[in-house]
Design a protein with these regions (language model features):
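Rossmann-like NAD(P)-binding element
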Residues: 2-49
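Solvent-exposed alpha-helices and their adjacent loops that cap or buttress functional pockets
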Residues: 8-10, 43-44, 95-97, 185-187
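General structural feature for long, well-ordered alpha-helical segments within catalytic domains
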Residues: 33, 37, 60, 83, ...
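A generic alpha-helix structural signal
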Residues: 38, 91, 219-222
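N-terminal cationic-hydrophobic initiation segments that often serve targeting/anchoring roles
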Residues: 41-42, 65, 167
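Rossmann-fold dinucleotide-binding core
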Residues: 49-126
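Long, compositionally biased stretches enriched for glycine and/or charged residues
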Residues: 96-224
Length: 224
């Protein structure tokens, strides 16, 4: 993996990560400049997945899919994976468990519409709702929105993990920012969803097991 400001370097690449611009102060690619960059990247390399690594790049995913016609399986964001890792870290502290023993998903839209389905989360192989009390889960829910946006190192690490999983075809579920279809909710928007990956990009969306309350929250989020 290498970084460059030369757009022509994407020719022949197996994956492309869109992160920061070269200007000072450093800012994420977004808005019209970011969309123009995504257009050039997609034109120069018509096969590689394009991963938007930043926390402010939802519009690139949305507009790239809806305006440029790029497949949502090819153009998506990796910042939700950084958020998922941060959530796993605070769950591990609350539960007194190792972070690698935490399995948790994240859905919705940052930062006020973040949904963690605790019923399907696990800690050391046990259901999170069996390990943690209702008070502990409420305390975690109250902290989650403050974890957004993730820092630059967390964002970079998350993007690298998604690329590694995609290229090695590892059967691992990650959180990604995916453009929403009309059947799923409000078209033209994006949402955090669990996905599996392959060298072409997103292999499949993984439907989470949601409680009645979380399903209502998620469906409401997708419609707005």
């Amino acid at each position: 993996m290498s970084g460059t400001a030369d757009v022509a370097a994407v020719v022949g690449a197996v994956a492309v990560i869109v992160a920061d611009g070269a200007a000072h102060p450093v800012t994420e690619w977004k808005d019209e400049g970011g969309l123009a960059l995504v257009r050039r990247v997609a034109g120069l390399n018509q096969r590689a997945p394009i991963i938007c690594a930043g926390a402010q790049q939802a519009s690139l995913v949305e507009r790239g899919v809806n305006e440029l016609g790029i497949s949502r399986l090819r153009l998506f964001g990796s910042a939700p994976e950084a958020l998922r890792s941060a959530i796993a870290a605070i769950v591990s502290l609350e539960a007194g468990a190792a972070p690698q023993d935490i399995s948790v998903s994240v859905l919705g839209r940052p930062m006020q519409q973040i949904i963690v389905p605790w019923d399907e989360a696990s800690i050391g192989g046990r259901s999170a709702t069996q390990v943690l009390s209702a008070a502990q889960l409420a305390r975690l829910d109250a902290r989650i929105s403050r974890l957004w946006p993730p820092g630059p190192y967390a964002l970079g690490s998350a993007a690298a993990r998604l690329v590694r999983t995609a290229l090695t075809r590892t059967p691992r579920v990650h959180a990604a920012l995916v453009a929403v279809t009309r059947d799923e909710g409000a078209p033209g928007r994006s949402a955090m969803m669990p996905v599996t990956l392959d060298p072409a990009g997103i292999a499949a969306l993984v439907p989470p097991a949601l409680s009645s309350r979380d399903r209502v929250r998620f469906e409401t989020t997708m419609r707005t």
